[in-house]
Amino acid sequence: MELPAVNLKVILLVHWLLTTWGCLAFSGSYAWGNFTILALGVWAVAQRDSVDAIGMFLGGLVATIFLDIIYISIFYSSVAVGDTGRFSAGMAIFSLLLKPFSCCLVYHMHRERGGELPLRSDFFGPSQEHSAYQTIDSSDSPADPLASLENKGQAAPRGY
């Protein structure tokens, strides 16, 4: 299944609008958390080739999913009293429901920019992949790199 091609600016605009409406009743840490992540999204729009920017935005979206669940569950009963409170809570919940889909789209953009997940199979141990680089403790290199100079009659530099 192919993900739809959605512009990052559209994702930011939708979440900014829903966060603004959510801040009518929820303030404080809800606003700081969500607007900080939206600022990371603006950074990702400004630097189109940056894997770090889109990766930070993706990580922030995932973090705000959990933070929004906690924040809404704690303060929902005291906020959703009047019509404005119910509207604001509804927009915050709608934003929360859209965030996993937004994470999938942003992850697709992250992969297009050349990013990888930091949790790979070699996270807990050494990688089994072989690359063109030699490791420092590789047995392919000679034990004494200056031995070849001594065999040719050249003076080897002395260490201090």
From Swiss-Prot:
Swiss-Prot/TrEMBL GO biological process terms: regulation of blood pressure; response to hypoxia
SMART domains found in the cross-reference section: AGTRAP
Membrane spanning residue stretches: 10-30, 54-74, 87-107
Pfam families: AGTRAP
GO MF, one example: angiotensin type II receptor activity
Record-linked InterPro entries: AGTRAP
Compositional bias annotation for Low complexity: 137-149
Region of interest: Interaction with AGTR1: 110-122
Residues with the Phosphothreonine modification: 135
Gene Ontology CC annotation, any one: cell cortex
Biological role: Appears to be a negative regulator of type-1 angiotensin II receptor-mediated signaling by regulating receptor internalization as well as mechanism of receptor desensitization such as phosphorylation. May play a role of negative regulator in cardiomyocyte hypertrophy induced by angiotensin II through an inhibition of p38 mitogen-activated protein kinase pathway. Attenuates type-1 angiotensin II receptor growth promoting effect and angiotensin II-induced phosphorylation of protein kinase AKT and of STAT3.
Protein name: Type-1 angiotensin II receptor-associated protein
Originating organism: Rattus norvegicus (Rat)
Gene name for this UniProt entry: Agtrap
